[in-house]
């Protein structure tokens, strides 16, 4: 047990170094690829709780998202806004700016693919993140198709701090069987209750 725990800590530290993550981030082994990471984010971002409380939740997705970045948001009841494809092949930024204006009190999440696994188009991560954060929304980048080929940085620019990224190590050389990875800013997490109560979550349980 202790040996495996040390290996897991070393793996977390190595991933954090590669992705520019610091103490303000959590590296989470989520399970089955990026799909599991996104489903975990639905909980961590407090989406279902916000909807249950009557708060508007809007999720902005790109023109070429995988089902793993569509269905988790749709199934939780969020409003989905799909951006059109621009002439350059990425998401249409004029539509993005409009979609970010969801009204006072709304929870807005922008969830985009860093690279299309259909066209190979690579998004301008820093530019898009800058616009999203300036509007007060949360930014998720799905690197499932791009992680083996692209650099990943939680802050690609000083004014472009990404809230979360997900990727699928099973798509790397030697990666089959590896757990999906979610890296999330701790201050972006709205619901800290464990997704699955059980071993390792006892400190969250009340004595009553």
Roles of regions detected by a PLM:
Residues 1-208:
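Pyridoxal 5′-phosphate
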């Amino acid at each position: 047990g202790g040996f495996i725990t040390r290996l897991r800590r070393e793996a977390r530290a190595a991933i954090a170094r590669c992705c520019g993550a610091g103490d303000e981030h959590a590296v989470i082994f989520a399970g089955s690829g990026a799909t599991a990471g996104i489903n975990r984010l639905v909980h961590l971002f407090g989406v279902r709780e916000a909807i249950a409380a009557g708060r508007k939740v809007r999720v902005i997705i790109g023109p070429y998202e995988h089902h793993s970045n569509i269905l988790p948001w749709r199934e939780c009841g969020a409003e989905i806004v799909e951006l059109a494809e621009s002439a350059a092949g990425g998401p249409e930024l004029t539509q993005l700016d409009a979609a970010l204006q969801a009204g006072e009190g709304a929870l807005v999440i922008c969830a985009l693919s860093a690279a299309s696994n259909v066209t190979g188009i690579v998004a301008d991560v820093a530019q898009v993140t800058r616009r999203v954060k300036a509007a007060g929304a949360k930014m998720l980048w799905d690197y499932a198709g791009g992680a083996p080929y692209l650099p990943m940085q939680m802050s690609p620019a000083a004014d472009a701090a990404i809230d979360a990224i997900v990727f699928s190590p099973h798509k790397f050389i030697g990666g089959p069987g590896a757990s999906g990875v979610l890296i999330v800013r701790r201050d972006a997490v709205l619901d800290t209750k464990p997704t699955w109560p059980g071993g390792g979550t006892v400190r969250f349980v009340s004595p009553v």
